[in-house]
Amino acid sequence: MEWILPIAGIIAAVAFLILVIGIVVVLLSVKKNLDHVAKTLDGVEGQVQGITRESTDLLHKANRLTEDIQDKSDRLNSVVDAVKGIGDSVQTLNGSVDRVTNSITHNISQNEDKISQVVQWSNVAMEVADKWQNRRNRRDSANYKTSSVANETNHSYTTRVDNK
């Protein structure tokens, strides 16, 4: 029975050796997987840094764009207010023109007979003025002919007297 103890020791040593070899194999596999995970994380970290930079740039651009849009919106609001003011002015002007037109139409309707008489009298006055002018022109024309004939007669008389 003495031989059992050394055999048990050898079996225990072989079992321990198998256990150690199994643990080493598992640890080497875990190390390989951890190295692969570390490389993947390094790549992901680089990508995250790139994404972070791009996101920061995009945020800055978005902020500038927002400020630009706000500025343009403020300027556009002033233009809209000005156009509204112009629209109000045009509307007021249209109301004034309507009131003046209505007033003129009303006054014309009320004074239609008087206006008709004024037009008739002005036509009569223009006819009288035309006739007066025609008469004056005929009289001036007749005076010119008479004075022209008298001058010719006087000239012929003077010429005959001088010739004698």
From Swiss-Prot:
Note the superkingdom of the native organism: Bacteria
Primary location class: membrane
| Membrane association type | Single-pass membrane protein
Q: Does the keyword Transmembrane apply?
A: yes
| SUPFAM superfamilies the UniProt entry points to | Methyl-accepting chemotaxis protein (MCP) signaling domain
Name of the protein in question: UPF0478 protein SSP1024
Q: Which UniProt keywords apply?
A: Cell membrane, Membrane, Transmembrane, Transmembrane helix
Q: Where does the UniProt annotation locate this protein? A: Cell membrane
Q: Where is this region: Disordered?
A: 136-164
- Tell me one Pfam family matched here: DUF948
What transmembrane ranges does the database entry give? Answer: 7-27
Q: Which residues form a coiled coil?
A: none
**Similarity comment:** Belongs to the UPF0478 family.
Q: Where is the composition biased (Polar residues)?
A: 143-164
GO CC annotations? plasma membrane
